[in-house]
Design a protein with these regions (language model features):
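Histidine/cysteine-enriched polar flanking segments
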Residues: 1-130
Length: 130
């Protein structure tokens, strides 16, 4: 890297803040490094967004859900979410749908990895030679 970023490192959060995007990250399993590693291996950071502020994550990652709770997220069961989906999506609250399951994680997949778009935007045809 000619600009020297490789030697000194790049602080992503600091860089984003300097351009006006000040984010507050929620770390997988909080601040305990041992718990972070444990829940990372059970896909604690793997989530699927349903709407702004609403996403699906594994219920088995209890420390990650607790950390999300400390950042204002409400944890709900899938059945409650389905009964009140419009309320949760349109309500503006921060919600995590806590998906139960231990078998799926064995295949190294979380909620994001287990999705497939049902509709896609049409893409423009490629020009010849590109």
């Amino acid at each position: 890297h000619k600009d020297g970023n490789r030697e000194r490192g790049v602080d992503l959060l600091g860089s984003l803040k300097r351009v006006g995007l000040d984010l507050c990250p929620v770390f997988c399993s909080g601040s305990d490094p041992t718990a972070q590693r444990r829940e990372q291996w059970s896909d604690g950071a793997n989530a699927f967004a349903l709407a702004p502020g609403v996403f699906v994550a594994y219920a088995r990652n209890e420390r990650t859900l607790a950390e999300l709770g400390r950042h204002g997220y409400r944890s709900v069961q899938p059945e409650e979410f389905i009964r009140n989906a419009s309320y949760f999506i349109d309500g503006g609250d921060k919600v995590v749908v806590a998906l139960k399951g231990s078998e799926l994680v064995r295949g190294r997949g979380g909620p994001r990895c287990l999705t497939l778009p049902l509709a896609r935007l049409a893409s423009a045809p490629r020009k010849s030679g590109s």
